[in-house]
């Protein structure tokens, strides 16, 4: 049985994610590392792109401890066939050759064949898709973002993840393998 992560939202709803260690082992380890230490708790979702995705954070949850990059999953595990990315999946964001974000996960709102093998699917939503579809429709406002060509809109009324509750089914998960060279993205710089 797979580990699960339950996102308890401030509005009382919850999103339950089944984590898929066999599909993206190091990515799952990194998510568990951040979630188990409470770094995702009391976090307002930072970016919503209707018709594309809900980005939970682009600042590593505002914690220096989460400001690290991990190797692309295909480099660590070329033998694993990556899963297709579509609504109902949970994917890890990344910064190209610099690596994947430690814990900057997102929910696709459409089929994303161009993401396959780049932004790994490391979980699937087993409860609470209605909450994700609700998030797609909330009122947003633009915010300044330091990466050219990337438009960022945040909810006008904060949509807060109160707490992430893990059920690791009695298993232990190691700390993630990190990139040897940490070329941190510009959207993290204002926090260092």
Give, region by region, the residue ranges found by the protein language model.
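Cyclophilin-like peptidyl-prolyl cis-trans isomerases
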Residues: 1-192
């Amino acid at each position: 049985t797979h580990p699960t992560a339950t996102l308890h939202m401030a509005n009382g709803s919850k999103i339950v994610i089944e984590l898929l260690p066999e599909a993206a082992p190091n990515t799952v380890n990194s998510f568990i590392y951040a979630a188990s230490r409470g770094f995702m708790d009391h976090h307002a979702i930072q970016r919503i792109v209707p018709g594309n995705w809900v980005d939970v954070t682009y600042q590593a949850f505002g914690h220096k401890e989460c400001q690290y990059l991990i190797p692309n999953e295909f480099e660590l595990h070329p033998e694993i066939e990556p899963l297709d990315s579509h609504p109902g999946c949970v994917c890890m964001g990344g910064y190209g050759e610099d690596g994947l974000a430690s814990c900057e996960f997102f929910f696709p709102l459409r089929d994303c064949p161009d993401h396959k093998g780049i932004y790994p699917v490391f979980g699937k939503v087993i409860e609470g898709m209605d909450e994700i579809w609700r998030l797609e429709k909330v009122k947003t406002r633009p915010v300044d973002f330091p990466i050219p060509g990337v438009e960022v809109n945040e909810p006008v009324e904060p949509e807060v993840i109160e707490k992430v509750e893990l059920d690791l089914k009695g298993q232990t998960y190691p700390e993630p393998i990190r990139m040897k060279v940490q070329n941190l993205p510009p959207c993290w710089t204002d926090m260092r």
